[in-house]
Amino acid sequence: MPTHNSHSQPSSEDEGPPQSIIFGDHKLPEHPPTPNSPLQQTTNPFILESDGPHRQPHQSTIYSPGPFREPSTSRSPSHSRSRSTSPANSPGHSTISALASQSGVTASAGLGMTGADTAAASSKPTFREVPVPLSPTALSRQTSKSPAKSPRMGKGEGYLDPTILSVASGSRNSGKGKERTRRKGGHKYHSLHVQDEEEEEPPESDALRTRGKVGLNAYEKALWKWVNVDDLDGFLQEVYDYYKGKGIYCIVLARVLNLLTTFFVIAFSTFLISCIDYSKLFSSISTAEAVGRLEDVLVAQCITKGSFAHTLFLIILSAFFIFQVASFAMSVPRLLDMYRFYTHLLGVPDADIQTLPWPEIVRLIGDIRKHNPVTSLSNGQATALADMVGNDAKAPAKKLDAHDIANRILRQENYLIALFNKDLLDLRVRIPVPHVLTAFIPSSILISSADAPLPSLQSEPERKFLSFGANHLTKALEWNLRFCLLGYLFDRRGQVRKEFVREKRRKDLVQGLRRRFIFMGILNAIFAPFIILYLLIYSFFRYFEEYHKNPSSIGSRQYTPYAQWKFREFNELPHLFERRLDRSYEIAKEYVDQFPKERTALVMRFVAFIAGSFAAVLLVASLIDPDLFLHFEITPHRTVLFYLGVFGSILAISRGMVPQENMVFDPEASLNEVVRWTHYLPVEWRGQLHSQMVHQEFSKLFALKIMIFFSELLSVILTPFILFFSLPPCAAAIIDFFREFTVHVDGVGYVCSFAVFDFARYGNVDANQPETGLEGATGPDGGPAADGFAAGKPSRPTTRRTTSSSPSRLKHRDWRGNENKMEQSFLHFKATHPDWQPSDPSSSLFLDRLMGAGTRNRHGGGPVSAATGGISGSIYGGGGGGVGGRGLGVDGSVMAEMEEERLRAKRQSYERAWAKSSHLHRPDSSHSHPLRHPHSAASEIIEEEEGGEGDKGDDSIDGWSKRVKTDGETDDEEERERLWKDEGVVGLLQQVLGR
């Protein structure tokens, strides 16, 4: 098979290479090339040649050989690289596409061919450049030329086969100076076989031409969407939302039904409030001439005759409904893109999304990134060409593993998890009290600034606050926190603003955050009446059927929103977190119900007996005489049917509050099982699991649904006070947290430091020295590390511990998460994604030492106590909480007996290791930060294994190196001033509407 290799070097006369390229390794056609094969050239792929008198009767679609092809036999010197369109055949998974194909372009314009050339080259593009629309001058120049007969395509296996110059042209131009210059680049191009024009046309050519006129097929659209992703965070978020929504049909159905529900609530509430004359209705019922038709009590033109408040309420709800409809219509194209991405690129049909585990989706996405690395984000903000043919051409493509995907999807949620874990948000109701009124208010509900939990509050002058309620969170308050905090920290692309990691902007950022809190407090106070009315109507329609069908459900419980944020772990996706909590509901309800409630049980038994007696008598009487059921009135206008419903509801509620007679009382064992799933065990609870204090605190986290509902209604009134008075003093601590706990990860960007799983700085990689990190870091002279360096190694760029400007704010900062949150998150993430291998040596060292400690304990037969926060619920747990196969529970997966035994043994070793690691050594309270919870003095130290200390504290490891800011780095003053100027009320309102 004759081929020709040409080495070319781009010169100053040539255009630069394209920003996006594609290549493939498909098989070449069987026909050998002809020496006189002409080079084909097309017009812009997005401009179709108009019909004209010179158009040949038989013309087929022409496919360009690629942007780096040098024409061999061309009459005009202006012939150069052609802009290509894609072929007909869909590429395989190894194909890399930077631009989807555009077919249907005629070959009549600009094709220079000799008269003796009767054969046409069948070319498949090797490289393709983003098409640039032709100018009118260039278009007229091309259309003015005499069109030549179009060659016909040869049959090939794929559309990414490489091409080169023909042998004849290559030998003829080998001595040219321009060709010698190009030969220095080392780029290799391979020729394609051609097919004679007189040969029989392949049978699929008609289909190719027809499809080319239509446009891209579904696979090419999905591939084009993937390689042109410019916001990988947003794209992965859409991928996860599509997976969580169970496919396009479930998502569309859910959103349509949600729109219909909103419309029904608005329309039906308007009808009930404005369109019925209740005076006629009740008067007709009380008289003998009862009205029996609905039209007798209807109000004519009820909507136009309504009051101003009702009209305003209706306008606001209608605008909200129209906004939801518009949002749904705008989301349909993105849903179709996700459908094509899952179906054609991942190979996951819509019916299998509901049963496929998320780790398998992550693996498929990683395979696509491995086979198709050329995207708009191949190297951060660099172009795809720099990745493939630049200085890093020999470097492997950056991987996209489960950890990277989770950090991108949960980039914002990880900060909220850390804020709740560090207890930096004061969510209590705090109202300032004038000094003249402090003598008339009980001191139990008054606090002073000296008693405030945050340092910023302690520095304020003496002032009394009326405070009631504990830290609680509602959906309304959570939405406001997302807007005020995350909308302030992140830009429109979901990336952390660089100003937050620089201390020189601290004062402006604190003032800006305080203004956002105050503004949202005022805005919530204005719209509070409308929000309460809508919540009342919606909740009545939603919960009435549930409570009417099952009255005992009024005593059911669920975790509060505040408890969910306390339980959630770093890099834990919402559906995995919900599955973990769902497994704890039954045992949590058992723990709460079995606790001694003798007085309540005695009263409820009496109430159940009385209500059951009345209900039994009425039911027996109705069976004897059925007319009594509907016509006998016990009280005026109240029949037997009404009182049967009343006494039946009382009986069901009272029975639900009476514990079962055969229940075994063991609260400590029950709470241990709850901790197994929630992974939440404060230090204050340890050793007190049987006490009433722990029961009361857990009951606040696992509250009655009816109480949560009333809290949501009450929060509409209290949220303005929390935003206006409680949260503004926390602004300084929040801004400091954003700066101190933000790190830069190569290829991912700025993320929360706890989500990186950097045990050398924020965790317990060394069991004998658990408090690693900046508190224990020393400089070369044995003193404390300063200016972001510890022991000669680069530290976090956003922290300067011993500068004169901030001598005490960062000196005693607790760099570790409370309750070993990061360690638990790492172990659970590893269990959920078994195929993931941590790239950080400190993470691997932590895992190896835990497994080693568990192995020693297993051989020694040491007991494992679930009270220490055991991880059996998430690390290979046998009760469905483990991970078998691809993230499924062991009990729910079909595995061999040997695999089950291996996982069971690993589970036991991890449990024993966790039993020892949960009692990690902590420093005394005198060196802790005021925000930190007090820890028990008793601690247990894991026996340290030999070696493994060389990697401790290294911040530049396998792509997770921290970005160090140099002293000479400057900022763009114009952009900075534009970003941080006071936008005023109008700007904040625009941001609220944008959310």
From Swiss-Prot:
Intervals, Cytoplasmic compartment: 1-255, 333-516, 538-605, 660-705, 727-995
GO cellular component terms, semicolon-separated: autophagosome; cytoplasmic vesicle membrane; endoplasmic reticulum membrane; Golgi membrane; phagophore assembly site; phagophore assembly site membrane
Segments crossing the lipid bilayer: 256-276, 312-332, 606-626, 639-659
Subcellular location: Preautophagosomal structure membrane; Cytoplasmic vesicle membrane; Golgi apparatus membrane; Endoplasmic reticulum membrane
Record remark on domains: Forms a homotrimer with a solvated central pore, which is connected laterally to the cytosol through the cavity within each protomer. Acts as a lipid scramblase that uses its central pore to function: the central pore opens laterally to accommodate lipid headgroups, thereby enabling lipid flipping and redistribution of lipids added to the outer leaflet of ATG9-containing vesicles, thereby enabling growth into autophagosomes.
Principal cellular location given in the protein's record: membrane
Entry protein name: Autophagy-related protein 9
Annotated region (Disordered), positions in chain: 1-208, 771-817, 914-978
Organism: Cryptococcus neoformans var. neoformans serotype D (strain JEC21 / ATCC MYA-565) (Filobasidiella neoformans)
Classification via Pfam families: ATG9
Superkingdom of origin: Eukaryota
Gene that this sequence comes from: ATG9
Matching PANTHER family: APG9 AUTOPHAGY 9 (PTHR13038), AUTOPHAGY-RELATED PROTEIN 9 (PTHR13038:SF10)
Mode of membrane association: Multi-pass membrane protein
Biased composition (Polar residues): 1-11, 92-106, 137-147
Record field: catalytic activity: a 1,2-diacyl-sn-glycero-3-phosphocholine(in) = a 1,2-diacyl-sn-glycero-3-phosphocholine(out); a 1,2-diacyl-sn-glycero-3-phospho-L-serine(in) = a 1,2-diacyl-sn-glycero-3-phospho-L-serine(out); a 1,2-diacyl-sn-glycero-3-phosphoethanolamine(in) = a 1,2-diacyl-sn-glycero-3-phosphoethanolamine(out); a 1,2-diacyl-sn-glycero-3-phospho-(1D-myo-inositol-3-phosphate)(in) = a 1,2-diacyl-sn-glycero-3-phospho-(1D-myo-inositol-3-phosphate)(out)
Family, as annotated: Belongs to the ATG9 family.
